[in-house]
């Protein structure tokens, strides 16, 4: 399929639905990301194929014209039917995302739906094919700070040990046992002897050392967790000892993170050909899809699903009728799917910029924003499934805070706020845009001029926003299974928003309080220290918690074995299908 041709047709259809269309050559060059000269060549090529007549504009300022041979709807449906017959998912998703009328697809919507969700191939392979609404960022374990990417890493890689969320303790994984000295400075791990990487080599202690040394480089996500490592010694092929400069009872908890997934030392790292040792192996990754297959020689139980496919589709409005395994669907049109909701998945918050000169530096202004940001009112006026009101990082510790909007005027006067523009950052997620607009409108009622600044998902997740760009930012955080480590990471991870926006003075205080927290061996005392640290941040209004979101996923009714993954998704390695799907998909793999 010629995607450039249909990109042009959809673009011009939104100018006019007539078959004869006036246009500027430069506009086509822009949508094709080419020069005007190359755009003209393309048009002559299409004219030679007989699909259009091209009439260049004569004289400066005169528009060119195209006369199409066939209506766009007819051409789209012809190509779509061909793509369905060939199981060409890439072409189908491309057509569905074009800015063209949705009702064109109504007669074949059932066939389109059946291509996604659960599939059975001709050679009895069970496939879960799903759609994600954005391109993946990075799958480099040392760089990812996003829940979806971290979830995928747990499916294709393994950490040295794991954290059991139910029993609240570290359990064996790659390491079957470990020993730590009384001073918590020397940690020895004993590795299983038959773990294979995806490329066939046995995992050994040198791979553990290689992974940790790579992670100890500056500018990695886990760098802050490993700064105390003094030495890594491979005693033998399956024993490794890590010596620390200072006592750290928390050290083993870091090793549970997917950011410290053990990678092979003999393969140059390539996140598009990622080799690890997890239950699934990566067989294809590009901007359109990520395809995983079960790793037959996985050292634990082999996944029952044979293949998992993630297809990227960023135009969610056109795709509401297609099963989105990890988000919501139109349940009226997808009766085989059921909704699965979970409350308290992470926390949404606002963080103030401690680097930029301006009114946000004034505690009184931040307090005024605290009283203005009433999540109870937001929930009542805006969201049906807003989740629960937040006053702490943890849902179980949150209470409904008391807000006093009558104090706002006095606080603004104390901050000497004169109605100047305050830059308010938000991501481009639809619910974030909805909430940020509500916040801006509410602020205006109190005389606060918030100017919304849209920040891309990548920039927001990896702190790529420059410190001069905004005064405050709204963001969400989805923690891993280990709640204590998640909180430490939230405040200390250099890729996350707090470390990027907090002033050096606040960061220094966080570091001191975090160290005190890590050295405390008693869980109840650590809990009290967390509350104390969180209260210090919120009472000084360095950050304001909004709500703990409610997460919705669509699950096919035939899926069984669903267990919660730390990042709010279900563990693909444990999923199985009770009744085989009625549709047989073509097999394009062995």
What positions do the PLM features span?
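Append "and occasionally in soluble cytosolic enzymes with long acidic Gly/Pro-rich linkers
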Residues: 361-441
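Periplasmic binding protein-like
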Residues: 448-492
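Surface-exposed binding/hinge segments that line
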Residues: 223-265, 284
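Aromatic- and charge-enriched surface segment that lines or borders ligand/interaction sites
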Residues: 18-20, 42, 145-147, 177-219
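N-terminal lobe/hinge region of extracytoplasmic solute-binding protein
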Residues: 131-180, 588
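Extracytoplasmic/peripheral linker and loop segments enriched in polar/acidic and small residues
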Residues: 490-555
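Ligand-site clamp/hinge motif
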Residues: 297-335, 344
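Long beta-strand-rich cores associated with HINT superfamily self-processing modules
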Residues: 555-590
